[in-house]
């Protein structure tokens, strides 16, 4: 089922008697053609408890650079694998993903568990720009707020100065974090947005 798909390894973190250890939870494959998508869905993975996990949590907890950024800037919570990959490529190692645009109680409990090991000042919800992402961001914010998390939702309509130009809205062609260039993401970080 993963043949000819772009594969992401999903890892978790578990405690053993000697500290935190990474654990491979599954492999998820993204369809690369419409035929694949129609046959087996856009994403296919071996069974795992997705509702209990946060993608890229292992880096947040075990990688010193990611840990430092998480302590300083907080968590950037996105929808998916490609969003995390683009943010990390741009140097934002404090990115994680819900693997969707909603959050389960199990994922909230996972964030509580992460917060007990890594202090972070806030969570920035950087979900997709589409209606599902915007609605999801508001619902996720509400649920996280009720669990004591300081949460900010990324404002897709904000004015930003890219390349020293006059501030203007983020182009409509950018629909999610993965659509941004490395330079655009780095500009947002320099402006203190995340």
Set out the residue ranges of the language-model regions:
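Phosphate-handling DNA/RNA-contact segment within nucleic-acid enzymes
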Residues: 1-119, 137
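TOPRIM fold recognition
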Residues: 35-37, 72-73, 81-194
């Amino acid at each position: 089922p993963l043949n000819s798909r772009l594969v992401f390894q999903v890892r978790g973190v578990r405690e053993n008697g000697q500290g935190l250890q990474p654990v491979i939870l599954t492999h998820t494959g993204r369809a690369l053609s419409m035929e694949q998508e129609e046959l087996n869905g856009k994403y296919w993975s071996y069974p795992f408890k997705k509702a209990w996990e946060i993608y890229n949590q292992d880096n947040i907890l075990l990688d010193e650079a990611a840990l430092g950024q998480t302590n300083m800037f907080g968590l950037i919570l996105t929808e998916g694998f490609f969003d995390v990959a683009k943010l990390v490529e741009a140097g934002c190692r404090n990115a994680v993903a819900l693997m969707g645009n909603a959050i389960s109680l199990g994922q909230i409990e996972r964030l509580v568990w992460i917060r007990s090991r890594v202090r972070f000042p806030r969570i920035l919800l950087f979900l997709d720009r589409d209606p599902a992402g915007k609605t999801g961001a508001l619902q996720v914010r509400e649920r996280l707020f009720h669990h004591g998390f300081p949460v900010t939702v990324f404002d897709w309509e904000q004015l930003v100065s890219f390349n020293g130009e006059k501030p203007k809205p983020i182009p409509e062609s950018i629909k999610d974090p993965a659509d941004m260039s490395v330079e655009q993401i780095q500009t947002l970080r320099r402006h203190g947005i995340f």
